[in-house]
Amino acid sequence: MSTLGHQYDNSLVSNAFGFLRLPMNFQPYDSDADWVITGVPFDMATSGRAGGRHGPAAIRQVSTNLAWEHNRFPWNFDMRERLNVVDCGDLVYAFGDAREMSEKLQAHAEKLLAAGKRMLSFGGDHFVTLPLLRAHAKHFGKMALVHFDAHTDTYANGCEFDHGTMFYTAPKEGLIDPNHSVQIGIRTEFDKDNGFTVLDACQVNDRGVDDVIAQVKQIVGDMPVYLTFDIDCLDPAFAPGTGTPVIGGLTSDRAIKLVRGLKDLNIVGMDVVEVAPAYDQSEITALAAATLALEMLYIQAAKKGE
């Protein structure tokens, strides 16, 4: 079975239309795209409420509400005029085979990166970030991680496929450097001795955005950065449609401002994960995810326009 655009892809949640109504391209490796969007409809590693496999479709669907604005506020330019972005649809794999998903996603990412493309990926549960990190580390070397989440996902439970273990595994594999990595919005228990800088939700909500960004930049330095945003970083008032919601999170306004503040970092890959639309209200979680994804593209476009 091919990785993209297979005629026998029997998923009910794949490949309806592109993010922001961007063109679909099932052969992105040979395209002239700068950034390639890939959906990963996978939720077998979920510990809470399942349904993240429907996340990519929900993000794409609600993104049509964002497609009309050309000179987007407050950027005052159209990202699409500076970046060539294509959507290659969803990863096709044998549903029920977590190992195949992981291997195919890593191979897909490696092929895109070798062709000079950058990736914005939509989960799916947060486990999908691990094969993406493996591919990016092969191409860019050890990276810094900027991680928005309610949970650190550094738990060691011995399970190969678990959306709470990726950032325990990634440092051990040499993919990321915890000493140059930041976890933002955390509000569950975590290990204070694993090297990561944790900016918990209490302090992020109380501190100024510029102050937080300055600390992030200081920690990350000039390392290549992988940016991952678990939508449960947001308070459930702003993102109820997720598998493991935790009260006391960030507002959507604060999250957007923090993402915009990352513009000067050397970001080499990005993802937005853990949207589970079955638990959403009026698509507000999917809209938050789509908006954050769009802001991620805008910070790339802003650098290209300088």
UniProtKB/Swiss-Prot annotation:
SUPFAM superfamilies: Arginase/deacetylase. It catalyses: agmatine + H2O = urea + putrescine. Keywords: Hydrolase, Manganese, Metal-binding, Polyamine biosynthesis, Putrescine biosynthesis, Spermidine biosynthesis. Its cofactor is Mn(2+). Its EC number is 3.5.3.11. Signal peptide: none annotated. Pfam families: Arginase. Mn(2+) binds at H126, D149, H151, D153, D230, D232. GO terms for biological process: putrescine biosynthetic process from arginine, via agmatine; spermidine biosynthetic process. The keyword Repressor does not apply. The keyword Metal-binding applies. Pathway: Amine and polyamine biosynthesis; putrescine biosynthesis via agmatine pathway; putrescine from agmatine: step 1/1. It comes from the Bacteria. One of its GO terms (molecular function) is manganese ion binding. Belongs to the arginase family. Agmatinase subfamily. Catalyzes the formation of putrescine from agmatine. This is Agmatinase. The gene is speB.
